[in-house]
């Protein structure tokens, strides 16, 4: 027998084995199925209990995604739940972002690699203590005004466009396609907002168009009749999950849940089991007892119910993306902290060596039999110590340098920040009025959210604008302005801060800036000039120190309160005149010797007032120790570097008199108390 004949015989012998292997592989792929039957979740033919937790990719630096997921897995979780914020992925119309913090596909694939399942909450509304509930703020500029979270045709067309980009990206990652996604949530707690079922039906139609019929769609609503009646759509075969206070008896609520699911399709699921709670500025930090939280979870898991911890790991509201809440009216406004620690078992900086993590971990093991993995190592943190800062410039000195001339606008009436294209941060409004001999009364009936008011003489005045006071959304809307005895008109400067858009409730259409007329002694001011304050290039702020070496004439060109006919005194005189009540930029530096010395740290702002901070051009968020409770901002190690590290601070009022900050190891939520 020749060599070729032997090879043919070998192929004949191996062919049945190859066919069998292919068949087995195909069968295995086909068996990848997740569904609900007999009021039980099933995965690949076996009953399955969801032990999940929310871990939001957009609240964690991407370098830490794997670390946080591993800590969630060591807690005993088999499933990760996350929102998808539209405003991060489409910050401008048709401008799509899916890199870095927004690389959701990489995050989902990473969960899959770690053998974790995913429940994906695609919105379009997410709530989540996130700016505008995840909606892009440019939606607020559309005319005629659209109605969010409704069957408004313009709104639906934009949702369709957004999902037409997002859903094809996640379709290959569905469980039936070999990926980790077992469930996809539409909307979020809609039953506590409205009852537009046509809107919900449309969302289901779009989701099915891109994701097919095999994926389990679900809704989440509060465990009360009214919420479930308004927010569920069982006729579309959409699974209804519930959330409720951890102090509640879960099983009567799970029984109510059955009434809003098809018969046999109501596996008990709390899709938001609250491990802690949110905190607003001016409140004490919210905490919950570890033992009582663990007991509440045990009541669900030990009776084969399913639960998703909200949050398993909270993370951080970096940048300007924190949300806010309102009460009985839109003036009853409270903004969320930069920290989204949430008193979750995995702390903001990843710590798991705490009572809550250990208590929940024991309960999960006891009730489900999920093996206990080795407890993750402690997170290394560093105290880099005291850092001296120097004042770089007053905002008024450099407004023309950090305000895009093409975006400066003139209008008879003040324009909203959104209409100015300034979606986040700050906007400076300027106008003039004729002064009386006595003081005047300034009135701004509607400002969102916080305005600092300054005045100066329009001509012949080389001094900085004089600080008058604050007008806040939640308090008095009037200010008394003292007489300046000007020979000319008085220039009025109003710096407005967008502190975060409302993310929940009836006042979610939350435009920012001055949203009413402005009056002086009952007379409406007109002829406004608006300067968007761009903080995108704070890394170049040191260059603004060149202003200090400019000639008087050059300085007059860049000063908002100078005119070309007036010679200003050397700007350095003002930059070194000491501590004053004005918005200004400060800069500090600290050195890290090597890559191995890079550690997580916190910047303590005790002694400072209110503002926003950047580390190596990364916006680590807002600080407001004057009212607390958060004193220190989290700085994850990946944004640091060996060598020189630069901290830029935009302080709205006055800095620590010693012009120092401190880099410390631990978080601190004791300010303002």
UniProtKB/Swiss-Prot annotation:
Enzyme class: hydrolase
Protein's recorded name: Beta-galactosidase 8
GO biological process, any: galactose catabolic process
Source superkingdom: Eukaryota
GO cellular component term of the entry, any: vacuole
Catalytic reactions of this protein: Hydrolysis of terminal non-reducing beta-D-galactose residues in beta-D-galactosides
Similarity field: Belongs to the glycosyl hydrolase 35 family.
Predominant location category: secreted
Compartments, record wording: Secreted, Extracellular space, Apoplast
Family matches, as Pfam families: BetaGal_ABD_1, BetaGal_gal-bd, Glyco_hydro_35
InterPro entries, A to Z: B-gal_1-like, BetaGal1-like_ABD1, BetaGal_gal-bd, Galactose-bd-like_sf, Gly_Hdrlase_35_cat, Glyco_hydro_35_CS, Glycoside_Hdrlase_35, Glycoside_hydrolase_SF
Active-site feature positions: 189, 272
Acetylation found in the keyword field: no
Annotated coiled-coil segments of the chain: none
Swiss-Prot/TrEMBL keywords: Apoplast, Glycoprotein, Glycosidase, Hydrolase, Secreted, Signal
Signal peptide segment: 1-20
Disulphide linkage map: none
Record lineage: Eukaryota, Viridiplantae, Streptophyta, Embryophyta, Tracheophyta
Molecular function GO terms recorded: beta-galactosidase activity
Glycosylation sites: 38, 230, 304, 329, 401, 489, 540
Enzyme Commission identifier(s): 3.2.1.23
Provenance organism: Oryza sativa subsp. japonica
């Amino acid at each position: 027998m020749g060599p070729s004949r032997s090879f043919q015989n070998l192929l004949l012998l191996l062919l049945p084995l190859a066919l069998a292997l292919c068949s087995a592989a195909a069968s295995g792929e086909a068996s990848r199925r997740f569904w609900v039957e007999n009021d039980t979740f099933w995965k690949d033919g076996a009953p399955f209990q969801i032990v999940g937790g929310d871990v939001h990719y957009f609240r964690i630096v991407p370098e830490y995604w794997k670390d946080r997921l591993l800590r969630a897995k060591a807690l005993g979780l088999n499933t990760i739940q996350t929102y998808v914020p539209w405003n991060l992925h489409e910050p401008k119309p048709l401008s799509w972002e899916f890199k870095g913090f927004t690389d959701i596909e990489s995050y989902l694939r990473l969960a899959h690699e770690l053998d974790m399942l995913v429940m994906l909450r695609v919105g379009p509304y997410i709530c989540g203590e996130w700016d505008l509930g995840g909606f892009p703020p440019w939606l607020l500029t559309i005319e005629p005004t659209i109605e969010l979270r409704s069957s408004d045709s313009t709104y639906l067309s934009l949702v369709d466009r957004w999902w037409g980009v997002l859903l094809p990206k996640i379709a290959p990652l569905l469980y039936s396609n070999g990926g980790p996604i077992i469930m996809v949530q539409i909307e979020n707690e809609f039953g506590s907002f409205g009852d537009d079922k046509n809107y919900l039906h449309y969302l289901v139609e779009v989701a099915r168009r891109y994701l097919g019929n095999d994926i389990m769609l679900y809704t989440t609503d509060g465990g009360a009749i009214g919420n479930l009646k308004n927010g569920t759509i069982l006729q579309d075969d959409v699974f209804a999950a519930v959330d409720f206070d951890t102090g509640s008896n879960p099983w009567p609520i799970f029984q109510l849940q059955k009434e809003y699911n098809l018969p046999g399709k109501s596996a008990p699921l709390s899709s938001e089991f609250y491990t802690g709670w949110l905190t607003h500025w001016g409140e004490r930090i919210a905490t919950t007892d570890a033992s009582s939280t663990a007991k509440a979870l045990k009541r669900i898991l030990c009776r084969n119910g399913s639960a998703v911890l909200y949050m398993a790991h909270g993370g951080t509201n970096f940048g300007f993306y924190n949300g806010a809440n309102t009460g009985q009216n839109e003036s009853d406004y409270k903004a969320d902290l930069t920290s989204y620690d949430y008193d979750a078992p995995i702390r903001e900086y990843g710590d798991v060596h705490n009572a809550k993590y250990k208590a929940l971990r024991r309960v999960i093991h006891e009730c489900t039999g999920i093996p206990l993995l080795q407890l993750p190592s402690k997170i290394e943190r560093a105290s880099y110590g005291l850092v001296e800062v120097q004042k770089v410039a007053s905002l008024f000195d450099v407004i023309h340098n950090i305000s895009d001339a093409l975006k400066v606008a003139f209008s008879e009436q003040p324009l909203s920040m959104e209409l100015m294209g300034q979606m986040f941060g700050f906007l400076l409004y300027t106008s003039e009025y004729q002064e009386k001999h006595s003081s005047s009364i300034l009135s701004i009936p509607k400002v969102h959210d916080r305005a600092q008011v300054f005045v100066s003489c329009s001509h012949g005045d080389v001094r900085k604008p004089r600080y008058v006071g604050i007008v806040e959304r939640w308090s008095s809307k009037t200010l008394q302005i003292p007489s300046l005895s000007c020979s000319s008109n008085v220039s009025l400067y109003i710096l407005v801060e967008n502190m975060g858009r409302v993310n929940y409730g009836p006042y979610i259409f939350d435009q920012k800036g001055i949203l009413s007329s402005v009056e002086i002694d009952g007379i409406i001011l007109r002829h406004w000039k608006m300067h968007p304050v761009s903080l995108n290039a704070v890394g170049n702020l040191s260059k603004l120190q060149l202003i200090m070496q400019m000639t008087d004439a050059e300085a007059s060109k860049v000063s908002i309160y100078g005119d070309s006919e007036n010679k200003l005194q050397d700007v350095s005189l003002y930059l070194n005149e000491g501590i004053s009540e004005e918005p200004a930029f400060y800069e500090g530096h600290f050195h890290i010797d090597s890559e191995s010395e890079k550690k997580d740290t916190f910047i303590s702002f005790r002694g400072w007032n209110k503002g926003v901070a950047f580390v190596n051009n990364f916006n680590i968020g807002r600080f407001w120790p004057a009212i607390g409770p958060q004193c220190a901002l989290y700085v994850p190690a990946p944004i640091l570097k060996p060598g020189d590290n630069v901290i830029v601070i935009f302080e709205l009022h006055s800095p620590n008199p010693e012009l120092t900050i401190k880099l410390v190891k631990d978080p601190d939520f004791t300010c303002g108390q």
